[in-house]
Amino acid sequence: MQSVTYRRRDYLFAVRRKVVDDQLGWTICMRSPRTHEWLPVLGERPFAGHAEAEARLVRLAKDNKWEVAYAYGIDFASPENK
């Protein structure tokens, strides 16, 4: 399984398995810098599959210019020298 955690300032964003509205699913969450608790991002619905949720997180990260904080199970290509 592939998993990426993104960072924006002191906040981390990742896909977590959580119960939201009495439904267990994959949810895009934000880690609170004060409590260190993973909280569901408001307005984002739970996904049935992990790949769906990761794809949505990648789109959000690209649109908001978040940087990669951690990556598991993904090989990133080394930057090319120009």
Where are these regions (language model features)?
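Residue-level detector of alpha-helical recognition elements and their boundaries
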Residues: 53, 68, 72-75
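N-terminal processing/targeting junctions
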Residues: 18, 48, 53, 63-66, ...
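A short, exposed loop/beta-hairpin motif centered on an aromatic-Gly-Thr core
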Residues: 29-54, 60
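Short arginine-rich
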Residues: 58-71
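Compositionally biased amphipathic helical and low-complexity segments enriched in hydrophobic
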Residues: 3, 13, 25, 40-43, ...
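Short N-terminal "domain-start" leader segments
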Residues: 1-30, 34, 71, 77-82
